[in-house]
Amino acid sequence: MRLFKDHVEKLLGQPMVMIYKPGAAGVIAGAYVKESKPDGYTFFVISNTSLVSSMVTRKADFTLDDFTPICTLTLSPIIFAVKKDSPYKTFKDFTEAATTKKLKYGTTAALSATQLIVEAIGRQEGFQAIHVPIAGGAKAMATVLGGHVDMAGVSPTGIESQLRILAVVLQNRWEAYPDVPTLKELGYPIGPEVYFSLYAPKGTPKEIVDRIHGAYTRVLAEHREEITKRAKGINQIARVLGPEELGKMSRDSYDFVKTMVSKIQAPVN
């Protein structure tokens, strides 16, 4: 949201105050927004995957129906990476090895969408790797470098030059790593892309939704070079998609997470 903030404030003639409600993977912030008036003054910035994961795995006191989707802001690629001297040169090398030995992989949280993607691939390919939850992307990468896990699936953190990236979770190849295939290319059209997005309380009028969505669309169009460069600096891709697309993406993400959690019969915290 910071990428757009100054320009959106000028366009709307309204200051934007960012209130942090940390804790419980978005549950506290989500509850706050759910109880807010649908007057166009309170919004919820969270990734689609974190939002639905909090509903499925953390007993959140809200559902998708409690929010009005506004638009996406940035796409956050997920990469699967190994040590540069790893025997696994490709993602297929990893999946094939995982069918004959117990390999370990790390993600930033138990029951994260990234873990569920690997679980889904394991069911497709006939393996069950050992999941290691690690607090934070940088620590996960360091855990790979230290040889404590065989692979990590995380958002880029800036130390990718020390690793070998095997695959990326995107619909199309990432400009930052054009030689790295997507999971979709490799035959795994599995799991949601991760978008940091803007949601409003349920009942927010359409004219407000359209105005806010329009403001972000216009700001990206008029300041594309600046915002794209800043997004690249934090390993994200600036992309504004509208309420219909965000709504469908959120529902699809929810269905994927709920289905996979049910399949692995994971305990709900």
Kindly give the residue locations of the regions a language model identified:
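Extracytoplasmic "Venus flytrap"
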Residues: 1-4, 22-24, 106-112
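Short conserved active-site loop signatures built around small residues
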Residues: 18
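Short helix-initiation/N-cap motifs at beta->coil->alpha
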Residues: 21-29, 75, 131-146, 244
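Hinge/capping helix and adjacent helix->loop/strand transition within the periplasmic-binding protein
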Residues: 8-10, 35-41, 55-135, 193-230
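C-terminal lobe and pocket-closing loops
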Residues: 75, 155-227, 252-255, 260, ...
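Ligand-binding pocket segment of bilobal, Venus flytrap-like solute-binding proteins
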Residues: 104-180
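Short, Asp-centered acidic motifs that coordinate Mg2+ and/or phosphate
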Residues: 40-44, 79, 150-151, 165
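Mature extracytoplasmic/periplasmic domains
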Residues: 218, 224-247
